[in-house]
Amino acid sequence: MNLIDMNANDITMCIEGKDIEMKHPICFGKVYDKWLVSRCGKVWSMSRNKLIKGHTSHSYNKNNKVMSAIDYAIMVSEENWWGDGSGSKHTEGYQWKRSINAHKMVMDTWAPLYDNPPEGITWKEWEIVRRDLPSVYNHISKTICIDHIDDNPANNHLDNLRRVTPRDNNHTRKKKGI
C-alpha cells in the first residue's frame, strides 16, 4: 500500500496499482478509525496494514441459485454497549466482535441516509421528514433496506446499491424470483 493523499475525511491509497479513495467506515452510528472502506466495498485494516477479505456467507434463492454475501467482523469496545438487536453485548473488560454487512458499511459511509433520501422520496419530502418529523426519520432509518441493483450480493460497489422500503424490497425480490 502506498498512501497518496490524506485529509481528515478521505484517504487516497494505491492498492494493487490503482488509486482508491477510502474513508473510515461508519458502523452502528459510530466512525471506526481502525478500518478504511472504499466505494467498491474493499476494507483496509489499519492495524494489519492490508486489505481484509471478510467472511463470505452463502444462501439460496427460490431457484436454488447460490447467493454469496460478504460480511466483516469489527471490534466493539465501548462501556455498557448493547447491540442493535443482534444479541451482541459488551460488558466492562471484554471486547466483542460484531459482524457488519459490506453493503451496509459502504452505504452508511459513502451515502449516509441523512443526506440521501430512500428511493421514492423526493428531496423536498425528505427535508420535511428530517426537520419536522424526527420519529418518522428514526423509523425509516431502522427499517430501510439496502438493495443490490444487479441482485448480486457480492457486488458491494456504491453504484450498485440503493435504499428501498421493506415493501419495495420484498416486491422486487418476489418479481425477480430471489
Predicted regions and their residues:
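Conserved recognition-core residues within compact binding domains
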Residues: 2-145, 152-178
